[in-house]
C-alpha cells in the first residue's frame, strides 16, 4: 500500500521499483461492462494472465475508488463479487512473491480493511512533500536529470529561500518544464538563473490546504514504517492524530 498526498510520485516510485528488481509492471484498467456477468468474466481472464506472467507487479492507481468495497449497492451485486474476487486472489499464498500488488491512493482511510490487512498489503509505505532544504534540492536535481534538462549552475538554496519555495514534486516538475519553454522562447541554449526565477515567481500551484493536510495525516496514520514518516509526526500521539483527521473531515463535509 503506497499512500501520500497528491504529487509525491507514488506511481513513479512503483514503476521505478519494479524496473529495479527486474519484473514487468502492469496497470489495472477498467474491465467493467454494463452486461451482467461480463465484468466478472473479464476479471477472471485478467487474473489468469497475471498467473501466466508471474513474476509480475500489479499497480492499481486510485485504489480507493477503483476497488470499491463489499457494501456497494445498485449493480445487482457485481461490485461485491468483483471486490471479493480480487481480495481472495490477493490473499492467496500460492502467488505470494510472484504477483506483487501495489495499491496506490491519496486516501488509504477509504480502503476497506479487508484489502489493507497483512497477507494482502504487507507493507504500508507513505510518501510526503520534501520538508528540509536538502530534500528539496535533491528532488530538484533528480527531476532535472529525469527531464534531461540543461540548466545553468545556480544556488538553488538561496533561490528556494528567496521565493518561499514549498511545492510538491509534481509542482517542481511543472516549474522545470515551464522554465524550459521560457528558455526556448528567449533563445537560450540552457535554462538560465533568470528563466528559473521568473518561472518560480510566476507559478501559482493549485492550493487545497485542508485536503492536502488530510491526505498527509491519513498517510502518517497508515504507514507501518516510522522511518518513512516526517520527523514532526514520528512521536505524535495516535489519538491526537485520529482526532485531527476527524476535525479535517468535518471541515470538508466528510463523514468521520
Regions found by a protein language model. Give the residues of each.
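A short helix-loop-helix "switch/interaction" segment in the helical subdomain of ASCE P-loop NTPases
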Residues: 157-171
